[in-house]
């Protein structure tokens, strides 16, 4: 009997202990739509646990449901060319390249996996604006890029932002630099009668894109 008790004690000591995954909550200064209570956010976080530990990204991705950016949401979850979830995080972009220091975000591929790095200056941006940005960056899934691909991605961002404002108008926090970006894109979309006409002109005039080819795999000139 004593021997059996010792065995049971040893088994209990060697049994792996599982802990619930912990997430970084949305900053308290970020205003969320009423739908996004902490209880609701916690209920969706497991779906995005392989993407990020930061719940502000979980909220942003959830906001893409029912928008034109749901394709991007699914791509971030792993339905992309690599078949792996995209890792999303805030990161000082100058650590990658000093030339990226003022960028809002970049998509990156490393060792066969995709990453979306967002400038930390947007840590307190409305999740709806982050959602539109993610819809853009998730379009880039390989090492290639082009003017046509950027035109498509910027247009997608503008369309998604327009849709999110209809669903979550409180996302339009004019104190946010990211919201300023999104509203400029929205204006270009509307100016072109909801076509890419003026967004395309802006992309082609962007000094940072001057060395890009016209097309890339999956993106023809339109």
Model-predicted segments: where are they?
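Post-HExxH zinc-binding segment in Zn-dependent metallohydrolases
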Residues: 145-184
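Sec-dependent signal peptide recognition
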Residues: 2-10
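Hydrophobic h-region of N-terminal signal peptides that target proteins for export
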Residues: 11-18
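Auxiliary, metal-adjacent structural segments of Zn-dependent hydrolase domains
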Residues: 36, 41-115, 173
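Pan-zinc metallopeptidase signature
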Residues: 190-222
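Soluble non-cytosolic domains of exported or imported proteins
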Residues: 51, 124-129, 133, 147-148
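Active-site recognition of the HExxH zinc-binding catalytic motif
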Residues: 132-144
């Amino acid at each position: 009997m004593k021997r059996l008790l010792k065995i049971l004690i040893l088994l209990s000591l060697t049994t792996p202990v599982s802990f619930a995954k912990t997430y970084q909550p949305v900053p308290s200064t970020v205003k969320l739509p009423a739908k996004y209570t902490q209880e609701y956010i916690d209920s969706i976080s497991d779906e995005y646990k392989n993407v990020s530990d930061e719940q502000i990204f979980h909220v942003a991705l959830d906001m893409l449901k029912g928008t034109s950016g749901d394709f991007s949401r699914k791509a971030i979850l792993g339905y992309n060319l690599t078949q792996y979830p995209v890792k999303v995080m805030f990161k000082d972009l100058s650590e990658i390249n000093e030339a990226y220091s003022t960028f809002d975000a970049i998509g990156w591929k490393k060792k066969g996996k995709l990453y979306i790095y967002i400038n930390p200056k947007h840590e307190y941006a409305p999740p709806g604006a982050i959602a539109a940005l993610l819809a853009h960056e998730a379009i880039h899934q390989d090492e290639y890029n082009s003017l046509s691909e950027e035109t498509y991605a910027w247009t997608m961002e503008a369309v998604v932002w327009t849709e999110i404002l209809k669903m979550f108008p409180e996302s339009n926090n004019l104190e946010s630099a990211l919201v300023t970006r999104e509203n400029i894109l929205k204006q270009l979309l509307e100016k072109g009668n909801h076509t890419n006409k003026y967004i395309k002109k802006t992309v082609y005039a962007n000094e940072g894109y001057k060395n890009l080819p016209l097309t890339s795999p999956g993106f023809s000139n339109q």
